[in-house]
Amino acid sequence: MKFVSNVIRGTGNLLRFDCTIKRGVEHILQRRRRIRIVVLGSKNSGKTVFLTALASNLLNHRKGNGFDLNQWEAFVEEGLADSHKEDIADFPYSQYREGFAKENPEWPEKTTCAMSVLRLPLVFRKEGCKERSLLIEMLDIPGERIADLTMAKKSYREWCRWMFEKFGSQYSANGPYLEYLDNAKYCFTKDDLFNAYKTYLLAEYRKYSPWIVPSVVKLTKDGKATQFEQELDIRALGLSLKDQFAPVPIEWFESPEEWQTACIKDFAAAYDKYKEAIVDPICDWLRETDRLVYLVDILNILKSGSAVYNQERKFAEAVLGLFSRHKSYTPCGAIWDYLSSMVKTRIKDAYLVVTKKDLAVSETSDNLRKLADALLGKELRGLMNGIGEGNIRICAAVDTVSSRHNESGQEVTYAKISPDKTKTEPYEQVYVPDTWPSGADWKMAIEDGKFWFEDTYPQFDERENASPAQSGLDDLTKALLSSELA
């Protein structure tokens, strides 16, 4: 039975690979190189604004504006391409860009659709060189869906094992759910189990945890945001109330009683349906990603303390691990599975970016430094280095890179969250010591609030005095395209 499932899984991978080849041939015939950029990160990390800023930087790039792509100039070849052929929503770039440019800037609405893509067919021209055509695709995914990627490459049993390993590191948070499972043999109903798991998810939600799986309890399959706390009783842990699942102990698989076997069968079927409808379409796109940008919400981490800080790091490790070759399939299954895994990961560059840094204001704290040290630590860097064979860039966001000393001559880091996000006057600068953790190729600023409108979208003919935020965005844009415009 296991061999048959491996054959089916391997055949599915080959079919997806065949579709990849066909799309690649189409781009070759069009003589256009495609670059797919995917921005990942937990909920509210700034993915939509980041994508809008990046696209604006590309579309408004012209020689002499203080932004040099190795003397190449970018031009839109044939207007913004739509994505209707692949049944994926179009990223509303023009709407967001116009909203940012207003006298009273409008913040983009929360991303709710399953996925949206912005296609930029660009021509790059340089004196004395043949012009180059690039189709740049940028994928936007709701932050809620990122947690579902923990199901990728996992059967229901494998996912349960993974979830309970995570549970083991935070027993106090999920103790009631584990206690219910321990006592389930005495009085078990599926409804009671689902209610116990939803109660656990609600506790995680209130702690700003990114680990809300399945994500449909917060964002329905159709992209409608839910009132999770008020609608707990009616929210389904799956595609519908008839197709629900929750993690169960691995012991249930190894020596199950009759009621446990029936439960596992139903849960596994609901899990597979959910993966096919929600997770697999995202994974199919991610398999063809060339550039990966992972955003970390510094605002959420600093205001929430060490628990959220540790969760964010583990969340980043889990997501980035999906792209690492160290995590690929091995030839222990069907031969087709192994062959497809050899071409599965194509990411050449990965970037780790800290967002919302401008909301930190003056007051001595070492939280930011600790965060940077951890995010640039050996474990996470090891995952990033396993992603691709090209340049792996791990970068942190700062407003100003400088060294400041206290009266004793010791270096200090200033970081505190302003409780008033609507504050519009300039925040005090946050200074980070020059002795930045090794491994950061360069430092960049991606800012939030009013700073997005003032710094990320300046008048493109008046950029001589670009802000650190704009300079950072320029650096990232150049890095993303450096191998194509060498």
Residue ranges and their predicted role:
Residues N44, G143, T355-K356, R369-L371:
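Residue-level signal for functionally critical sites in structured catalytic/ligand-binding pockets
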Residues I37-A55:
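Glycine-rich phosphate-binding P-loop
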Residues I21-V25, R31, K43, L58-R346, ...:
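Switch- and interface-adjacent substructures of P-loop NTPase systems
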Residues I37, S42, P105-P108, G377-G382:
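Intrinsically disordered, low-complexity boundary segments flanking structured domains
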Residues T52, V343, K357-Q429, S438, ...:
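Canonical P-loop GTPase G-domain recognition
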Residues R36-G41, I136-L139, R291-L295, D349-K356, ...:
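Extended hydrophobic secondary-structure segments that form protein cores and membrane-embedded regions
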